[in-house]
């Protein structure tokens, strides 16, 4: 059956020949595929609105986790749970797509449109939305302060290098976390709220998260000075594959949670930083329909 879709392509990928070839091949199969290229902030959201006004129900995010977040935000603001999202991973880390096992080959990623789209959750933080993960504390500083030049040269390893060079500057944050049958208060070094499983270039903060369970996974790394050595171990290759090997994290799984902090805290939503002293988090079940590969580990 012919598909009608809009590909919103990150401006840095405008000359990507693999993407161009995949688009041409897809069109030659009889599908209608329009392409828009972003130039500045706000373009992705504007293109989504224009697409929906013109009868498109399927949007393809051609970019990294930030592009996926921008498009997810625009789709959620529309309020239609029948809208469909596909991903062509073209960013530095591609954390959500990597955990979902979406191919980085544009033609293969585009071919997922031949499969049924799966109902998936989106997480709301105050009036913002994200698909993959929100991070706070030290992990947020690493992600937001890693230079674009370093990311271009080293890919996901850039986040690791930034974390190691800033290790002596680690400062904890203080917060009060409350949800159904869960309450925790104290100083923490890192926080992950996961619909997906990893962030910051492969750090698996929420290794068991699912995108279709109506919940988000919570991972809190307490600021216990005796565990600082364990924090450093999170940045070596072995520990990065199993961050719970030392039992460092406080973990739970919730549909709603409130975070309160005595001073403004930065929370990074798939690359988009927001700042507040109160965060109301909610999992919105079956908010969007995603094109994911067969056997996707993020589906329960």
Curated annotation (Swiss-Prot):
Subcellular location field: Cytoplasm
Protein keywords: ATP-binding, Cytoplasm, Kinase, Lipid biosynthesis, Lipid metabolism, Magnesium, Metal-binding, Nucleotide-binding, Phospholipid biosynthesis, Phospholipid metabolism, Transferase
Cited InterPro entries: ATP-NAD_kinase_N (IPR017438), Diacylglycerol/lipid_kinase (IPR005218), Diacylglycerol_kinase_cat_dom (IPR001206), Lip_kinase_YegS (IPR022433), Lipid_Phosphate_FormReg (IPR050187), NAD/diacylglycerol_kinase_sf (IPR016064), YegS/DAGK_C (IPR045540)
Residues that coordinate or bind ATP: 38, 64-70, 92
The protein's name: Probable lipid kinase YegS-like
Active-site residues, as the UniProt record annotates them: 272
Main location: cytoplasm
EC number: 2.7.1.-
A GO cellular component annotation in the UniProt record: plasma membrane
Superkingdom field: Bacteria
SUPFAM superfamilies: NAD kinase/diacylglycerol kinase-like (SSF111331)
Gene3D superfamilies: 2.60.200.40, Probable inorganic polyphosphate/atp-NAD kinase, domain 1
Location of the DAGKc domain: 1-129
Phylogenetic classification of the source organism: Bacteria, Pseudomonadati, Pseudomonadota, Gammaproteobacteria, Oceanospirillales
Cofactor remark from the record: Binds 1 Mg(2+) ion per subunit. Ca(2+) may be able to substitute.
SMART domains: DAGKc
Cofactor annotation: Mg(2+); Ca(2+)
Function statement: Probably phosphorylates lipids; the in vivo substrate is unknown.
Residues given in the record as Mg(2+) binding sites: 210, 213, 215
GO biological process: phospholipid biosynthetic process
GO molecular function terms listed in the Swiss-Prot or TrEMBL record: ATP binding; lipid kinase activity; magnesium ion binding
Family as reported in the entry's similarity comment: Belongs to the diacylglycerol/lipid kinase family. YegS lipid kinase subfamily.
First-level EC class: transferase
């Amino acid at each position: 059956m012919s598909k009608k879709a809009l590909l919103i392509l990150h401006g840095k990928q405008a000359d990507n020949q693999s993407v161009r070839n995949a688009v041409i091949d897809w069109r030659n199969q009889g599908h209608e595929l329009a392409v828009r290229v972003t130039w500045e902030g706000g373009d992705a959201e504007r293109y989504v609105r224009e697409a929906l006004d013109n009868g498109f129900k399927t949007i393809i995010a051609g970019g990294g986790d930030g592009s996926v977040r921008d498009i997810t935000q625009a789709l959620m603001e529309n309020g239609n749970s029948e809208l469909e999202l596909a991903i062509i991973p073209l960013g530095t880390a591609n954390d959500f797509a990597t955990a979902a096992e979406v191919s980085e080959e544009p033609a293969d990623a585009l071919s997922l449109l031949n499969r049924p789209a799966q109902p998936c959750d989106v997480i709301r933080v105050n009036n913002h939305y994200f698909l993959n993960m929100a991070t706070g504390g030290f992990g947020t500083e690493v992600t937001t302060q890693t230079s674009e030049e370093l990311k271009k040269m080293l890919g996901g390893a850039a986040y690791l290098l930034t974390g190691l060079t800033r290790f002596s500057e680690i400062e904890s944050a203080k917060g009060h976390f409350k949800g159904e049958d869960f309450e925790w208060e104290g100083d923490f070094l890192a926080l992950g709220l996961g619909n997906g499983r990893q962030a910051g270039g492969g750090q698996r903060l929420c290794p068991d998260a699912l995108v279709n369970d109506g919940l988000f996974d919570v991972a809190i790394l307490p600021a216990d000075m005796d565990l600082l050595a364990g924090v450093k171990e999170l940045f070596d290759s072995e520990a990065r594959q199993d961050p719970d090997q030392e039992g460092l994290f406080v973990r739970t799984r919730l549909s709603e949670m409130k975070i309160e902090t005595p001073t403004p805290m930065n929370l990074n939503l798939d690359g988009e930083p927001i700042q507040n002293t109160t965060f109301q988090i909610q999992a919105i079940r079956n908010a969007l329909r995603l094109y994911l590969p067969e056997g996707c580990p993020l589906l329960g």
